[in-house]
Amino acid sequence: MNNDPNLEDVWWVELDLPAGHYEYEYLLINGNRISDPLSRRLTNGKTRIEIGAGGASTADNFSWQSDGYFRPELDTLIIYELHVDDFAAQGNGQGKFEDVIGRLDHLKSAGINAIELLPVTDFPGSHSWGYDPHLMSAVESSYGTPEEFKELVDEAHIRGMAVIMDMVWNHIRSSSP
């Protein structure tokens, strides 16, 4: 790895890799292994990236369909707060982003014009309300992929529904990078 002489704690590496899926983590001087603090996707606790042709990242290839979306006026918001795992579960506690999408029309017909998601950031373990986040830039993989999260937001916007996210910066897990 290379160190930027102008920025004491900034390290970088440049690799010529063929297109594919890659996982990495950082090995610290003290022997601890951590995920990239800016990870958008994790697999087994390791940062996962996808590299496309010519070395380009494929992370931002999502095709948004909700052109022209405008958030409802604040004084007109009718907010439904939900926990993805519990709200979308079919009695098994395994709710996913795609399951929430399947219930958006029901919420819309009830007059809801905004959903507030309890934390959807990565958390340790298999079940949590998200108030012990591990990485703030990665969605919880048991709910779905970053692309499936974007699809949820897009589908809500297509229906004229705002998406509010509960972010928990003051409860971040002590073992997080």
Features from the language model and the residues they span:
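Substrate-binding/active-site clefts of carbohydrate-active enzymes
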Residues: 44-46, 67-74, 83-177
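The feature marks proteins involved in alpha-glucan
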Residues: 4-81, 86-92, 99
